[in-house]
């Protein structure tokens, strides 16, 4: 299984431009023979979108962008983060598209509400685990804070995941690279699964997103 991790420079609110970057990355992944392009948490809106999530037109623009992604006919599948509304609930979501079809849609379970994060103001926390059969492998999908708590990763393992795939919008601070590394190694040790971690690279106001995407084997190395 070949994955391309897209550490894209995304802009909050620039949904159409962000979608262009996702599709350009998908075309490059296709040229290189990748099976799956992995994009970051809330890639279509940029992170953190904050009160833009309260605008009535936001989901119209997000749905238009997702329609463009679904229409892409390359051999490479696309995993992309975006907000998604069901009824009155707004979710922090990740969707997997393959050759015009929605294969899976996962909703974030653990919402951070400390420091620079205020996701509980906007999003509903989900409870469902998502393990996706994809080209002979079972992918356990996670979004950022889901990895910081043991429950979602262990639930994915119990549901048959063979690989943990987590998309993130994790801002930099001086200690964060080492904290992340220890955390990911711990999850691998707890689950016995390999882990892929994808983070964006950009600046949003006072926040810096430093990428540092990583691939760990099942021993946490």
Predicted regions and their residues:
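Enzyme catalytic cores with a strong preference for nitrogen-chemistry domains
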Residues: 1-221
């Amino acid at each position: 299984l070949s994955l391309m991790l897209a550490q894209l420079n995304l802009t909050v609110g620039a949904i159409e431009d962000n979608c262009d970057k996702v599709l350009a990355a998908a075309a490059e992944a296709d040229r290189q023979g990748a099976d799956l392009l992995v994009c970051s948490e809330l890639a279509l809106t940029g992170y953190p979108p904050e009160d833009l999530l309260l605008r009535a037109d936001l989901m119209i623009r997000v749905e238009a962008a997702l329609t463009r992604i679904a229409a892409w006919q390359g051999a490479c599948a696309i995993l992309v983060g975006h907000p998604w509304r069901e009824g009155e609930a707004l979710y922090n979501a990740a969707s997997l598209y393959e050759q015009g079809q929605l294969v899976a849609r996962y909703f974030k379970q653990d919402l951070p509400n400390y420091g620079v994060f205020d996701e509980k103001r906007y999003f509903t926390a989900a409870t469902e685990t998502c393990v996706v059969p994809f080209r002979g492998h079972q992918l356990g999908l996670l979004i950022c804070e889901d990895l910081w708590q043991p429950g979602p990763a262990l639930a994915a393992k119990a549901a048959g995941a063979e690989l943990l795939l987590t998309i993130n919008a994790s801002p930099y601070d001086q200690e964060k690279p080492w904290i992340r590394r220890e955390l990911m190694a711990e999850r691998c040790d707890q689950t016995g699964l390999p882990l892929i971690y994808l983070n964006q690279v950009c600046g949003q106001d006072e926040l810096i997103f430093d990428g540092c995407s990583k691939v760990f084997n099942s021993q946490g190395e």
